[in-house]
UniProtKB/Swiss-Prot annotation:
Source organism of the structure: Influenza A virus (strain A/Memphis/1/1971 H3N2)
Region called Promoter-binding site, residue ranges: 249-256
Annotated Polar residues bias: 55-64
InterPro entries: RNA-dir_pol_NSvirus, RNA_pol_PB1_influenza
Listed GO biological process terms: DNA-templated transcription; symbiont-mediated suppression of host gene expression; symbiont-mediated suppression of host mRNA transcription via inhibition of RNA polymerase II activity; viral RNA genome replication; viral transcription
Motif extent (Nuclear localization signal): 187-195, 203-216
Recorded name of the encoding gene: PB1
Name listed for the protein in its UniProt record: RNA-directed RNA polymerase catalytic subunit
Subcellular localization, as worded in the UniProt entry: Host nucleus; Host cytoplasm
EC number: 2.7.7.48
Subunit structure: Influenza RNA polymerase is composed of three subunits: PB1, PB2 and PA. Interacts (via N-terminus) with PA (via C-terminus). Interacts (via C-terminus) with PB2 (via N-terminus); this interaction is essential for transcription initiation.
HAMAP family the UniProt entry points to: INFV_RDRP
Superkingdom assignment: Viruses
Length: 757
């Protein structure tokens, strides 16, 4: 069913069609090769914006550091990072004055969180810089490695599982003269294969102990690893993003908890809410400005863009903000919160993989690791790279670059939003003390500014004052990229406002289609995406019906499950035709078994198995939903699963869908090639960890990782739980006497083995 796209626009007002001009169809661009160049760009740019600051040397690591705080006031429109401490503190004081008690209350909320958070909070998140292996790892593995190293170095505060205790260990680790770590390495040997008698390379993974002195350890603890940000649409150049190690993460988490708590209480903050809630919040601010600008006042809105938000922010400024926000709070609390900005003032950026050189004539390739950039002869590089390396050389230590100013992407989104809102807050008439006044919205580096004044000159004066006030705290509004309109039309965080928010449907386009998890999940996710867009994004009934038909078509092509009575030949059609012919009630077959599609826009909320259950042949039901079916490795079945869908911008978001487990809910097996690499040792650790956690969850189904309290180990807890459960089951007649005896015997054996160990 091919559709002529112009038909979709016959009755669409022009402003609703803006979304079709977005670069959101097709595959997003990915980066290939090394991110070293992008990282050097970031480091060099950040230093350039703060170049008039003071240089100092870190006494512990020897890293040169640039401090632009309270530097010269800007004389031109170039972006700069010279924030003035007294201005930031004053903005904080005024924010508190307009919102009495806001800081106090947020501190109390955060204190509670600090005392309750468990260390497993740090296992969330994807890739994390693992300082023990000097590369990225899944968060859970990186945390396990860190705790293991701490333990072998006599740091044991984290045994109790509170995050705050783990952070105590981090602080102590920085005072140690040396740390002993375990690293993985590969050995290659040539051996003769007995079967084929050929020589083969055998790889073995070894673990070796290595001592790291205080300076090297500090450098690693303060290192942010960098990667290239992938899948960014609408940009010509790629850019670098950072991933911090486990030492920094916990501290950042607490600072962001505090800032989030403040943002929730600020009407101008676009974080931490999202979706419809965010739209409602924004619409309120706009309504307020428009009602107040009756006939006498003009009201204009700037769709704002800031130049290099992260690179002009400064951790020292954040330290000043935290010091102000937590005044009158207990000393321990102030200390915990001030560590993150202090660590960021001393951060090091890891330059990534380095450069790859190829010689076309000699068919040679060689990797120049980042560590060599400090000493290598520059004649091998092209001019632009040569300039970058020359500029960054004074900052290099062991393949990392000292980067004191700037924030790196996405680390303190909430706290930087608080700073932005504090400037918006100064637009009230009682602060401007003149005829113009402003308000607006702030979400991380994105902002919309609404200025009201009696005439155009007043609007201009208001914008100028806002611009200059921002400069004082290191925020640089871009005059080239911001534009101004009569209030009622603007864009903020990709929401388009035109007398109300227009659905920007194109942003959802990438999440339509077949996800590729398995037949069962894909069907469920596909219809849920359509349902959600009907609810949230003005997807009309006709378009939704069309989207559904296109989805079913796409799904059948993906899984080669065309209807049993079709003429299309695929490698599955022989089996599916046979099934079709044997089935009495053909309407009961799932689409993935060659059945018809029974979905329409009225029943998208019902999982397909439930929709067709009454129509199924009995033996088909038996095969489809049989947990003993040998062809299915079953996940634990939960009623709701989470899928990761890719909206067009922003992070992948998690979306819930109904999960009915059938023989179609298979789990693909892990690719074998990883087993021959140096990752193998890590993979085995990870599987071990996974198995233990799964086993533990079997015993404590409601645990969700709240470890048993007290001093018992996980094994002891599981044994005692097994005994209690067995006794209850035996007494209620659920298990026989023999089974009960066997369980008791097994428990005793386990305890005996532990004692011998």
């Amino acid at each position: 069913m091919d559709v002529n796209p112009t038909l979709l626009f016959l009755k669409v007002p022009a402003q609703n069609a803006i979304s079709t001009t977005f670069p959101y169809t097709g595959d997003p661009p990915y980066s290939h090769g090394t991110g070293t160049g992008y990282t050097m760009d970031t480091v060099n740019r950040t230093h350039q914006y703060s170049e008039k600051g003071k240089w100092t040397t870190n006494t512990e690591t020897g890293a040169p550091q640039l401090n632009p705080i309270d530097g010269p006031l800007p004389e031109d429109n170039e972006p700069s990072g010279y924030a003035q401490t007294d201005c930031v503190l004053e903005a904080m004081a005024f924010l508190e004055e307009s919102h009495p008690g806001i800081f106090e209350n947020s501190c109390l909320e955060t204190m509670e969180v600090v005392q309750q958070t468990r260390v497993d909070r740090l296992t969330q998140g994807r890739q994390t810089y693992d300082w023990t292996l000097n590369r990225n790892q899944p968060a859970a593995t990186a945390l396990a490695n860190t705790i293991e190293v701490f333990r072998s170095n006599g740091l044991t505060a984290n045994e109790s599982g509170r995050l705050i205790d783990f952070l105590k260990d981090v602080m102590e680790s920085m005072d140690k003269e040396e740390m002993e770590i375990t690293t993985h390495f590969q050995r290659k040997r040539r051996v003769r294969d007995n079967m084929t008698k050929k020589m083969v390379t055998q790889r073995t993974i070894g673990k070796k102990k290595q001592r790291v002195n205080k300076r090297s350890y500090l450098i690693r603890a303060l290192t942010l690893n960098t990667m290239t940000k992938d899948a960014e649409r609408g940009k010509l150049k790629r850019r670098a993003i950072a991933t911090p190690g486990m030492q920094i993460r916990g501290f950042v988490y607490f600072v962001e908890t505090l800032a989030r708590s403040i943002c929730e209480k600020l009407e101008q903050s676009g974080l931490p809410v999202g979706g419809n809630e965010k739209k409602a919040k924004l619409a309120n601010v706009v309504r307020k400005m428009m009602t107040n600008s009756q006939d006498t006042e003009l009201s204009f809105t700037i769709t704002g863009d800031n130049t290099k938000w992260n690179e002009n922010q400064n951790p020292r400024m954040f330290l000043a903000m935290i010091t102000y926000i937590t005044k009158n709070q207990p000393e321990w609390f102030r200390n915990v919160l001030s560590i993150a900005p202090i660590m960021f003032s001393n951060k090091m950026a890891r330059l990534g993989k380095g450069y790859m050189f190829e010689s076309k004539s000699m068919k040679l390739r060689t990797q120049i690791p980042a560590e060599m950039l400090a000493s290598i002869d520059l004649k091998y590089f092209n001019e632009s790279t040569r300039k970058k390396i020359e500029k960054i050389r004074p900052l290099l230590i062991d393949g990392t670059a000292s980067l004191s100013p700037g924030m790196m992407m996405g680390m303190f989104n909430m706290l930087s939003t608080v700073l932005g809102v504090s400037i918006l807050n100064l637009g009230q008439k009682r602060y401007t003390k003149t005829t113009y006044w402003w308000d607006g919205l702030q979400s991380s580096d994105d902002f919309a500014l609404i200025v009201n004044a009696p005439n155009h000159e007043g609007i201009q004066a208001g914008v100028d004052r806002f611009y200059r006030t921002c400069k004082l705290v290191g925020i640089n509004m871009s005059k080239k990229k911001s534009y101004i309109n009569r209030t009622g039309t603007f864009e903020f965080t990709s929401f388009f406002y035109r007398y109300g928010f227009v659905a920007n449907f194109s942003m959802e386009l990438p999440s339509f289609g077949v996800s590729g998890i398995n037949e069962s999940a894909d069907m469920s996710i596909g219809v849920t995406v359509i349902k959600n867009n009907m609810i949230n994004n003005d997807l009309g009934p006709a378009t939704a019906q069309m989207a559904l038909q296109l989805f079913i078509k796409d799904y059948r092509y993906t899984y080669r499950c065309h209807r049993g009575d079709t003429q299309i030949q695929t490698r599955r059609s022989f089996e599916l035709k046979k099934l079709w012919e044997q089935t009495r009630s053909k309407a009961g077959l799932l689409v993935s078994d060659g059945g018809p599609n029974l979905y329409n826009i009225r029943n998208l909320h019902i999982p397909e198995v439930c929709l067709k259950w009454e129509l199924m042949d009995e033996d088909y039901q038996g095969r489809l939903c049989n947990p003993l079916n040998p062809f299915v490795s079953h996940k634990e079945i939960e009623s709701v699963n989470n899928a990761v869908v890719m909206p067009a911008h922003g992070p992948a978001k998690s979306m819930e869908y109904d999960a009915v487990a059938t023989t179609h809910s298979w789990i693909p097996k892990r690719n074998r090639s990883i087993l021959n690499t140096s990752q193998r040792g890590i993979l085995e650790d990870e599987q071990m960890y996974q198995k233990c956690c799964n086993l533990f969850e079997k015993f404590f189904p409601s645990s969700s990782y709240r470890r048993p309290v007290g001093i018992s180990s996980m094994v002891e807890a599981m044994v005692s739980r097994a005994r209690i459960d067995a006794r209850i089951d035996f007494e209620s007649g659920r298990i026989k006497k023999e089974e009960f005896a066997e369980i008791m015997k097994t428990c005793s054996t386990i305890e005996e083995l532990r004692r011998q160990k």
